Amino acid sequence: MGELFRSEEMTLAQLFLQSEAAYCCVSELGELGKVQFRDLNPDVNVFQRKFVNEVRRCEEMDRKLRFVEKEIRKANIPIMDTGENPEVPFPRDMIDLEANFEKIENELKEINTNQEALKRNFLELTELKFILRKTQQFFDEMADPDLLGESSSLLEPSEMGRGTPLRLGFVAGVINRERIPTFERMLWRVCRGNVFLRQAEIENPLEDPVTGDYVHKSVFIIFFQGDQLKNRVKKICEGFRASLYPCPETPQERKEMASGVNTRIDDLQMVLNQMEDHRQRVLQAAAKNIRVWFIKVRKMKAIYHTLNLCNIDVTQKCLIAEVWCPVTDLDSIQFALRRGTEHSGSTVPSILNRMQTNQTPPTYNKTNKFTYGFQNIVDAYGIGTYREINPAPYTIITFPFLFAVMFGDFGHGILMTLFAVWMVLRESRILSQKNENEMFSTVFSGRYIILLMGVFSMYTGLIYNDCFSKSLNIFGSSWSVRPMFTYNWTEETLRGNPVLQLNPALPGVFGGPYPFGIDPIWNIATNKLTFLNSFKMKMSVILGIIHMLFGVSLSLFNHIYFKKPLNIYFGFIPEIIFMTSLFGYLVILIFYKWTAYDAHTSENAPSLLIHFINMFLFSYPESGYSMLYSGQKGIQCFLVVVALLCVPWMLLFKPLVLRRQYLRRKHLGTLNFGGIRVGNGPTEEDAEIIQHDQLSTHSEDADEPTEDEVFDFGATMVHQAIHTIEYCLGCISNTASYLRLWALSLAHAQLSEVLWTMVIHIGLSVKSLAGGLVLFFFFTAFATLTVAILLIMEGLSAFLHALRLHWVEFQNKFYSGTGFKFLPFSFEHIREGKFGE
């Protein structure tokens, strides 16, 4: 087994970095992305570590850059992305970066403050302009004598009788348009109908100086009499956030004020345009460099975070770090350290020292853009234990194949393949666009999985001879109706029977198996489902048992690699015998029945289901029960007995052997380590030798207790009993679980057929001149439903079922998945623009 089928061999290494070279060395390691730093200060608060001030400075620069980026995006200026990977700035360059970012931030804040003040002034002048314009119209309408009847309620009866001249007060302002109805009701109720409100909409929306949004507003003027009503009206206007403006009473004064307002608006507009041009120039200059600035700052921040994980020796001249790294990359790591030392100008080289440890290393599986998606499928179940068999290489084939068994349709497979090919061909452009849509990003990351699923679906679709629920007659059917008339069919037979069955036993009726896949004649046969159900059910059982046997076989390589002979003798061997004795025999029976019975003898073929049930019951009736082959009873009884013997073999032998080994070690008076004889009471020096020897030869079989460990026979028996029961029952339930291959395939085929019959078939049946137009609409509905239901919904369903078959039925035979992932210190996410990670 090469490295492709296992995780990379990892080692724990210790780094000794000179203080002046540590920054550059960590920078080079980040560019390499092959080491995972361990935190050597787990008990130290993050705010008490050595480089916390540098981290804060980087965070402050990052905050300023986020502010600039927000302003750039608000101005709809594209951020330039040349794909450049800038080098990490030296620590001394941080001051220049801080000064530059401070200057840009202050300049933008000053521009924004001035612009907001000018826009607020511009808004007030614009509102005043509309007030002067609209109020003039209101006063012109007030001169109309018909208005007197509407406003007469404002006059007291005594005043009307005296004939004194009427003098009404008024206020004018602007309010948001959606508040007008509520505003009007409030005025009416509070003032008890003693005010007169006129309002008119402002045609163009006005820009809010704070948010930048455009708001629809209306001009209003309120007439009232008396100071008490005036105070009430002003309080209501204040509550509704209406802007009140002074409005002259005479037309001449209003005209003069309007002229002055228009002049000020023109001047203000000119100043705003100049300020906006200046702001655009500043933001465009920043947009050219902001991506590079982000990468530089966040690389520096990542380096200082990593340096905070290191220890500092007592001389304050050296930083000590511990890292996990792949053994195969040690040379490149050494080269990166030398390069970092040279860049820093240090004369003292950095040292990398491999360490011996009994800690479990992280799991690191190398992937590329093709295998990445399949490895994620495996890791979603659980990160593999260090150096155990990696299921991902086998999943590359088995996953899309089992998906295709459930999804098998040549037409749907073509559509899925074309979609995947489109994503593969345009992957560079799509990656450069950095699409933030989570759903599309998930689909795009699995583009090679979708590609293989589509290709395998085309293959299984040809096997099923199913293309949009119709068969492809490529080689011509092997069945012929003509010979039936030679024997016993007549015209009366055709007229008297709506359905007739062909007899393949008659010469010439059946010409042999179809060259590839299923004969197209079955598509129009009334007993199509009977035939296909039998075929797909048996196929599901065969594929499932082969898949599970393959999983059990892979466990052997794990036991051999980890040197666990007990697991081979009392685990793998009885497991493989148990499964092959029962379910492997079932597969043999299926193939035997297919080959032993032909068209002439098929009516005498016994039921495999009945035979398999009777095999467990040891029931073999003498009458009305035909055997498949001679000696069947003896062989089946032998296989069942062997399978039953495998149960105590798995259950008892391993705990008993472990107990015997423990007792033998316990009763030994002395142990010999490398020629040094140690008695029952070892000295301190000898004890250290023992401890070091036990550490270096750490037990590769976790089930075998060492001398110092207490062996709990009861716990071991319970654990082994659970494993045995789980495996034996799992063989039955997992085999039944693979029948989902048959069920999903049947459901997909039937949905496809219903869609064809209920939609496209109706469109094709229209024979009038409008048939083409009708077919266009029916085909549109057919295409939409095909993509939505059969490709997306059914595809997702088949995907989830294939996922379950791999996680539960396949991987639980050999894959423990109890490891933890190798997370190297890398600048890759920063380079790709995934700053949050």
UniProtKB/Swiss-Prot annotation:
Its main location: membrane. It comes from the Eukaryota. Subunit of the V0 complex of vacuolar(H+)-ATPase (V-ATPase), a multisubunit enzyme composed of a peripheral complex (V1) that hydrolyzes ATP and a membrane integral complex (V0) that translocates protons. V-ATPase is responsible for the acidification of various organelles, such as lysosomes, endosomes, the trans-Golgi network, and secretory granules, including synaptic vesicles. In certain cell types, can be exported to the plasma membrane, where it is involved in the acidification of the extracellular environment. Required for assembly and activity of the vacuolar ATPase. Keywords: Cytoplasmic vesicle, Hydrogen ion transport, Ion transport, Membrane, Phosphoprotein, Synapse, Transmembrane, Transmembrane helix, Transport. One of its GO terms (molecular function) is proton-transporting ATPase activity, rotational mechanism. GO terms for biological process: vacuolar acidification. It is found in: Cytoplasmic vesicle, Clathrin-coated vesicle membrane; Cytoplasmic vesicle, Secretory vesicle, Synaptic vesicle membrane; Melanosome. It is a multi-pass membrane protein. This is V-type proton ATPase 116 kDa subunit a 1. GO terms for cellular component: clathrin-coated vesicle membrane; melanosome; plasma membrane; synaptic vesicle membrane; vacuolar proton-transporting V-type ATPase, V0 domain. The modification Phosphothreonine is found at residues 250, 360. Residues 408-409, 472-534, 594-638, 750-770 are vacuolar. PANTHER family: V-TYPE PROTON ATPASE 116 KDA SUBUNIT A 1, VACUOLAR PROTON ATPASES. The modification Phosphotyrosine is found at residue 364. Residues 1-388, 427-441, 555-572, 659-724, 810-837 are cytoplasmic. Belongs to the V-ATPase 116 kDa subunit family. V-ATPase is a heteromultimeric enzyme made up of two complexes: the ATP-hydrolytic V1 complex and the proton translocation V0 complex. The V1 complex consists of three catalytic AB heterodimers that form a heterohexamer, three peripheral stalks each consisting of EG heterodimers, one central rotor including subunits D and F, and the regulatory subunits C and H. The proton translocation complex V0 consists of the proton transport subunit a, a ring of proteolipid subunits c9c'', rotary subunit d, subunits e and f, and the accessory subunits ATP6AP1/Ac45 and ATP6AP2/PRR. Interacts with SPAAR. The chain crosses the membrane at residues 389-407, 410-426, 442-471, 535-554, 573-593, 639-658, 725-749, 771-809. Pfam families: V_ATPase_I.
